Design a protein with these regions (language model features):
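OB-fold and OB-like single-stranded nucleic-acid-recognition modules
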Residues: 1-18, 23-203
């Protein structure tokens, strides 16, 4: 008891909470959560310095909006697709990236795009409420640095455009993500006028 009293007043220290985070039961539960994140969501967590930091990091990682993105097999259509990326905090996450977001001068990144088996999301199902049933503030889960420069044309002129974070590659960047395969028949894009001649657009 004497040693605990010496730490009273230290910012962020709660002897009861800190001790609970270090119990064998808490450690085992954290192990299970990390295994779930890794095996299901492809999230690899950075090593925490203390049991308390580990608990808080896992809670923050779990308690966020969820998107389930339906992907179709890659048929050579232009655009991006599903990737596992490294985050600034040392963790990994599933993200939908456009091809212009990928560094084509990096052999590994270029090969990853070329060998991608699936294509951008066709359907997205979202969970917008937390475990208490309260709505998430979605603005807290936007990556403001996810903008990119794209090539556009206007009245016959080639332009460079700085695009703000898109719906699924920036605005949902800090959501938890699941990728599922959906039938190719659900994907009927119109990227050029000739796409309207496809059978899916003839009815």
């Amino acid at each position: 008891m004497g040693s605990r009293n010496t730490t009273v007043g230290v910012p962020g220290y709660d002897p009861v909470y800190d001790d609970l985070c270090a119990t064998p039961e808490a450690v085992s539960l954290c192990d299970d959560i990390e295994a779930f994140l890794y095996n299901v969501l492809c999230v690899e967590m950075p090593k925490a310095e203390t049991p308390k930091q580990r608990v808080e990091a896992l809670r923050a990682k779990l308690n966020r909006p969820v998107r389930v993105a339906g992907m179709v097999k890659n048929q050579g259509e232009p655009g991006g697709g599903p990737f596992i990326i490294a985050e600034k905090d040392g963790s990994t996450s599933l993200q939908v990236l456009e091809s212009v977001q990928i560094n084509m001068s990096d052999d590994h990144a270029r090969n990853a795009l070329a060998s991608a088996t699936h294509f951008n999301p066709v359907d997205i199902v979202c969970c917008l409420h937390d475990y208490k049933g309260e709505s998430f503030d979605l603005l807290k889960y936007v990556d403001e640095d996810a903008g990119f420069i794209s090539s556009k044309s206007y009245q016959g002129r080639e332009l460079k455009a700085l695009e703000l974070p898109g719906l699924w590659n920036g605005a949902m960047s800090n959501w938890n993500t699941l990728f599922v395969e959906v039938p190719l028949a659900t994907f009927n894009p119109v990227k050029v006028v000739l796409d309207l001649l496809r059978p899916a657009h003839q009815n």
